[in-house]
């Protein structure tokens, strides 16, 4: 594994690892574990949360798992020399699932940042 991972989301080590994460999703399709991985161009984005807590590089894509299309997002940053990777999934079109996933990421970043607000 990686050693001496710099903190944050925008360094070369984290960016390189994020590219591997996306490649893993594509590989799952080739191995037949999922079908129809839909990864839009320009998938890589950066969070812009206000206040305390880390930011993440993230990307969202869709995949067919056993006949159900799943919306999937992966968030990545580094804290204390370690990668922190969050993956959230919910059925495509499930608005409550989408809202819950966004709230989860926002709350977990406050925990990771040891925020008091």
Regions found by a protein language model. Give the residues of each.
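A short acidic-to-branched-hydrophobic micro-motif
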Residues: 1-20
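A mature extracytoplasmic/lumenal domain signature
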Residues: 3, 60-63, 74-77, 88-92
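Detector for Asparagine
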Residues: 4, 11, 38, 80-82
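Sec/Tat-exported extracytoplasmic proteins
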Residues: 18-35, 108-116
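Generic signature of intrinsically disordered, low-complexity, basic-rich segments
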Residues: 21-23, 67, 97
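Signature of long, low-cysteine stretches enriched in small and polar/charged residues
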Residues: 27-74
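Short, solvent-exposed coil/turn segments at beta-strand boundaries
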Residues: 52-53, 77-83
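Surface-exposed amphipathic alpha-helical segments
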Residues: 86-117
């Amino acid at each position: 594994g990686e050693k001496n991972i710099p903190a944050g989301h925008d360094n070369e080590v984290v960016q390189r690892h994020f590219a591997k994460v996306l490649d893993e999703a594509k590989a799952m399709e080739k191995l037949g574990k999922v079908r129809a991985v839909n990864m839009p161009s320009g998938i890589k984005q950066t969070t812009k949360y206000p206040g305390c807590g880390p930011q993440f590089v993230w990307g969202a894509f869709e995949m067919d798992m056993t006949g159900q299309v799943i919306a999937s997002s992966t968030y990545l940053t580094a804290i204390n020399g370690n990668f922190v990777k969050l993956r959230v999934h919910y059925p495509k079109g499930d608005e409550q699932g989408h809202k819950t996933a966004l709230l989860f990421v926002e709350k977990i970043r406050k925990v990771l940042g040891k925020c008091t607000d």
